[in-house]
Amino acid sequence: MPLLPGAEPFRHDGGEVGVLVCHGFTGSPQSVRPWAGHLAERGLTVSLPLLPGHGTRWQDMQLTGWQDWYAEVDRALGELRERCSEVFVCGLSMGGALALRLAARHGDAVKGVVVVNPANKVHGLGAKALPVVRHLIPSRRGIASDIAKPGGEELGYDRVPLHAAHSFRRFLRMLDGELPQVTQPLLLMHSPEDHVVPPVDSARILARVSSRDVTERLLERSYHVATLDHDAELIFEETFAFISRLSAGVGEAGAASRG
């Protein structure tokens, strides 16, 4: 199937500091493209992959699972590590969960983690019944475009494929057990009013990780897709400030320096 316009992956070759940006479940790179673009404009090397099964039609996602989504971000991380001296991982929603697993699995190869409204549990969708219901009903109503800003719209599926939702639930349960392995500096930004991932997920993540350098920011004016909402600029600036604080490869003037 052809890609939906706007769902294309994004790559920018900048300096020696790399950033991997991960989009969310049933979404597309469009939801985090301004975030990635801001970091690219500041001179960083940025990779924003399209997750398998996304960006076309929801039926294509039925044929994929968490192993496919994680393999893609793991591959993208590997490419950044070959190109850059330092790499940060970022993500929205499920993308945040994928970023946290990359941090847990790759240790010092990941310099820091930035997550926005990260998922820790599948809520609703009859989550506990998914193992059975997914064989009876292929999909249910979508979760895209939870945005407070008038006119804000996320490019995502209008249906949630239940086989994929079941796989996502299994992934989050596994990740919860791995969160203590996350030791890197962490910037977690979340919306008090989120109709997809409730704030309790962020609280759980903060309680489970082993990171000592932790910064929490509230996104008071935004819903779930905060990267397209009123607090988008705050997210972009906080992310760059976090990376600048931790990386010797980012110059004071804002441009990422190259060796």
Regions found by a protein language model. Name each.
Residues 182, 188-190, 194:
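Short beta-strand/loop motif that positions the catalytic acidic residue
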Residues 2-57:
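Short, surface-exposed "cap/lid" segments of acyl-processing enzymes
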